[in-house]
């Protein structure tokens, strides 16, 4: 059966200096990239917090670390990112929709200025609804930065999306949606709601639970609507 695949990484926290949050985020991301370039995959998606402080220098450093990646690069903003600077360096990679055969990945922006938690504005929900209405894909994946369900872990859920009900009010109208992906919580987890997979991507920097490794998610999308997730660790 025909399939396509893509890799999701998240929360790279690349800074002007190599160390952020007590770990060498530069070296850690390089290890992850070295593993990804040996995978036969169609795209690399970064689901926010590309950098730690959103400086132009850190985005340029990230660009250098990502240089070996020869596949399509897709990025969305996280609460640590500064959109003007992100846009300056990664304008070609910021996306709202991306098609892989019968599948489409649609992003929505949950970032609030100067706040750690997420919120989807009326405008953002309207845009998401419009993109869903327009989609001719058979199957859809949604990606945003913030968690949309309680993480059932040491993670502080008050730092997640503040208005998940408003999001579900939009998404529940579209049975084509197979999964919702996010980062922010620095941990790998999988949930399910009304038959839709809800997937948290680990961080390339460090995890906030007792997992000491760094990791990423590799998704395979089949033409019959099946989706498999392979979380890989280093």
Curated annotation (Swiss-Prot):
Residues bound to AMP: 13, 49, 79-80, 186
Pfam assignment, any one: Metallophos
Domain of life: Bacteria
Residues binding Fe cation 1, per UniProt: 11, 13, 49, 186
Residues reported in the UniProt entry to bind Fe cation 2: 49, 79, 145, 184
InterPro entries from the UniProt entry: Calcineurin-like_PHP_ApaH, CNP_phosphodiesterase-III, Metallo-depent_PP-like
UniProt EC number: 3.1.4.-
Enzyme class (EC, first level): hydrolase
Keywords, comma-separated and alphabetical: Hydrolase, Iron, Metal-binding, Nucleotide-binding
Cofactor annotation comment: Binds 2 Fe(2+) ions per subunit.
GO molecular function, one term: 3',5'-cyclic-AMP phosphodiesterase activity
Requisite cofactors: Fe(2+)
Family: Belongs to the cyclic nucleotide phosphodiesterase class-III family.
PANTHER family noted in UniProt: CYCLIC NUCLEOTIDE PHOSPHODIESTERASE CBUA0032-RELATED, PHOSPHOHYDROLASE
Designated name of the protein: Probable cyclic nucleotide phosphodiesterase Rmag_0669
């Amino acid at each position: 059966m025909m399939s396509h695949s893509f890799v999701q990484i998240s929360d790279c926290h690349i800074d002007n200096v190599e160390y952020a949050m007590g770990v060498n985020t530069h070296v850690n991301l390089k290890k992850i990239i070295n593993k990804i370039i040996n995978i036969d995959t169609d795209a690399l998606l970064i689901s926010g917090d590309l950098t730690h402080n959103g400086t132009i220098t850190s985005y340029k450093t990230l660009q250098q670390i990502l240089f070996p990646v020869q596949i399509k690069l897709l990025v969305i903003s996280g609460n640590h990112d500064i959109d003007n600077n992100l846009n300056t360096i990664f304008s070609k990679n910021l996306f709202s929709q991306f098609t892989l055969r019968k599948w489409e990945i649609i992003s929505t922006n949950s970032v609030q200025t100067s706040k750690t938690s997420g919120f989807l504005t009326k405008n953002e929900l309207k845009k998401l609804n419009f993109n869903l209405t327009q989609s001719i894909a058979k199957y859809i994946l949604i990606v945003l930065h913030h968690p949309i369900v309680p993480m059932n872990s040491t993670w502080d859920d008050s730092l997640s999306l503040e208005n998940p009900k408003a999001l579900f009010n939009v998404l529940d109208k579209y049975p084509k949606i197979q999964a919702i992906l996010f980062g922010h919580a620095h941990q790998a987890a999988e949930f399910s709601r009304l038959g839709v997979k809800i997937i948290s991507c680990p961080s390339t920097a460090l995890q906030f639970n007792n997992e000491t490794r760094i990791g990423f998610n590799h998704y395979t999308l089949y033409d019959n609507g099946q989706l498999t997730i392979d979380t890989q660790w280093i």
